[in-house]
Amino acid sequence: MGHSRPKYNSAVSTFCWAVANDEPFTVNDRGTELELLYIDDLVEGMFDLLEGREQHCEFNGVETVLKEDGRYCCVPVTHKVTLGEIVDLLEEFKAQPTTLMMPKMPNGSFAKKLYSLYLTYLPADKFKYALKMNADNRGSFTELVHTADCGQVSVNISHPGVTKGQHWHN
């Protein structure tokens, strides 16, 4: 999974391009599972090989089994996801400017890698979006982004002599 040509050699790139550009696309079976390797993980695996730190494996059918004395070199970081999971994440990314909600994207996660790819297809004019500023006689408050597990990022401006806040949100 990396930057490739939509509508040619990658369903993931096709979906990213279509969602980012408001183009129609078809998913024939949301339950179809893919095993994906992100380009950065492949490059890291190649550097490991060049530096003598490669991973070895054997194969049990199509399953990779890491084995120190395995006959094959492999990149152990792949992601098994369904087409439905991919499309659902892309729709969450697309909705972010409206909902301000960022999906969970832990380091190394498929979601974070997919988001990086999605952004490469996002037209420049979609990188900016209107924010709602709530203003009153005390100042203003503008929410920038929400997360499910890390709170929110916002800008709070108080006029001189005004104290705001002094409370917590769950």
Enumerate the predicted regions with their spans.
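Residue-level detector of flexible, active-site-proximal loop/helix-junction positions
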Residues: 32-34, 79, 148
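Residues that form generic nucleotide/phosphate-binding pockets
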Residues: 18, 89, 93, 144
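Residue-level signal for pocket-adjacent positions within structured domains
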Residues: 22, 29, 70, 136-139
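Mid/C-terminal beta-alpha module of Rossmann-like enzyme folds, strongest
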Residues: 41, 48-135
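Active-site donor-binding loop signature of nucleotide-sugar glycosyltransferases
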Residues: 29, 77, 160
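A short glycine-rich, His/Asp/Glu-containing loop-to-beta-strand
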Residues: 127-170
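NAD(P)-dependent short-chain dehydrogenase/reductase
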Residues: 1-35, 39-53
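Short secondary-structure junctions and interdomain/linker hinges
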Residues: 26, 93, 97, 148-151
